[in-house]
Amino acid sequence: MEIKEISVPLQGVVADYMNGKKEIQSCFDYLLTEDAFKQRLHDLREREFFRQDLVTHLLEYNTQLQAGEFTIQNIKALEDENTYVVIAGQQAGLLTGPLYTVHKIISILQLAKEKEESLGVRVVPVFWIAGEDHDMDEINHTFVTKNKKIKKTIFHDRYPKKASASESEFSIEDCRKWVEEIFKTYPETNFTKDVLQFVDDALGKSHTYVDFFAHLITKMFANSGLILVDSHHPALRKLEVPFLQQIISKYKEIQVGLRNQQEVLKELGFKPIIETKTNAVHIFMEIDNERVLLEENQGKFIGKDGVHSFSYEELMEEMERSPERFSNNVVTRPLMQEYVFPTLAFIGGPGELAYWSELQQVFHTAGFQMPPVVPRLTITYMERDTATDLYDLDLQEIDPFLNNIDNLRDNWLSNQIEEPIDERFIEAKKEIMDIHTSLQQFVKKIDPGLNEFAGKNELKINEQIELLEKMLKRNVEKKHEVQLNKFRRLQFALRPLGAPQERVWNVCYYLNQFGLDFVDRVMEQSFSWDGKHHVIKL
């Protein structure tokens, strides 16, 4: 493997944040300097955490996942008040979801190691699985290449319900068939059998989306020391009850904090991402096997527009009695993460960084400082065939990341023709239409009754010219088919569906191509935190 860093233009909040603009940096409580991390350590030492109870739960959960010894050691280290975490989170996507999930984990492993060395304290990596999420459409699919097209392949659960990913059981046999269909789209390699077995072993131990995800990640990062936490685990929720009750008691202040911070961002020219009703409580409650967002109405807490109604006292009692029925929304999830873990740093993608910028005053309302927010590493893998296509097309490695590949293709094609087709046909149409307009005027003078026919005649001539243009372009493309296919392959490999590779493709393709130790070899690379994009040549 060879790693190359390239500067890719950033957009929105993350661009201003990484470019050091003070206005947006003021929406966060810490800069990304070594002094700021030292200040964060000082601030965390002023707080208390339920470390022993947390360690007991994490040991039980990760042991069930058959986590490696290094992970167990890291969990036990959390008993020590001088141990901190670098944390990131994601939904439990099938087959681990898009590549960026793996890249988030690589990011927390790298940053935890670096900060442990530079700060002289124990720093352990934690990955927060968003098990409370109930939007199955975001996690029930992956993308593959089939018949020279990119296809979204969905796992259709035969018993769908609006439950959380931690509670949504699926048919192992149905999922196994879905996995086999995915792998049929991959080339057969020396690694295919082992990777299929690797996936099937994880699937065989699973009952839910979160189970499958957690077993795969545990096996994939077996020797890394990674700690997993399911945010919707009943045992964890039990530990969270005091803070859940605090959220309910402070929901108005939380909402005001959110609105005020969003106004700050609007004044800076940014459109807020988080959309909530003014009476939102920011807590979900499971009612009749569905996850329902609570709202306040005339002193009552209601769900489904008043179909369900609870008093404040009833909610408090139910939280004590059945804490597993409650979960956080997008606003309170970061707060709960801050309550549970002594967080040295949170790692997020561009979208997360943008929405966290809306939460500063929400954190303050809860009595917290927002942890340092570090943009995750961004990575693209470039296979040898892709590099060869770039060379054959006389393109630089950076070109597909700075330019639309369709535009690169069109520019290349136009350079193969002496005179631009589009321009020549535009001129021809104008010349012919000018002649025809004059002709129509002549016809109208002699026989006005033919005026409508003359207009139709003009349309037919125009259609024939457009048909000729279309056929010419098709023949030109056919003549250069070999080279144009290289542009298509570049698009599929580096910018599938016009998006970054890591937002579309799944890690299993690369495990199948390069072996089960692929992720381990990626983690051996040296990455920088300067916001540059990392291209790894395979």
Curated annotation (Swiss-Prot):
EC number: 6.-.-.-
Keyword DNA damage belongs to the record: no
InterPro entries, per the entry: Bacillithiol_biosynth_BshC (IPR011199), CC_BshC (IPR055399), Rossmann-like_BshC (IPR055398)
GO MF: ligase activity
Domain of life the protein comes from: Bacteria
Pfam families named in the record: CC_BshC (PF24850), Rossmann-like_BshC (PF10079)
Keywords (A to Z) from UniProt: Coiled coil, Ligase
Entry coiled-coil feature ranges: 460-483
Task of the protein: Involved in bacillithiol (BSH) biosynthesis. May catalyze the last step of the pathway, the addition of cysteine to glucosamine malate (GlcN-Mal) to generate BSH.
Family statement: Belongs to the BshC family.
Name recorded for this polypeptide: Putative cysteine ligase BshC
Source species of the chain: Bacillus mycoides (strain KBAB4) (Bacillus weihenstephanensis)
Chain's gene name: bshC
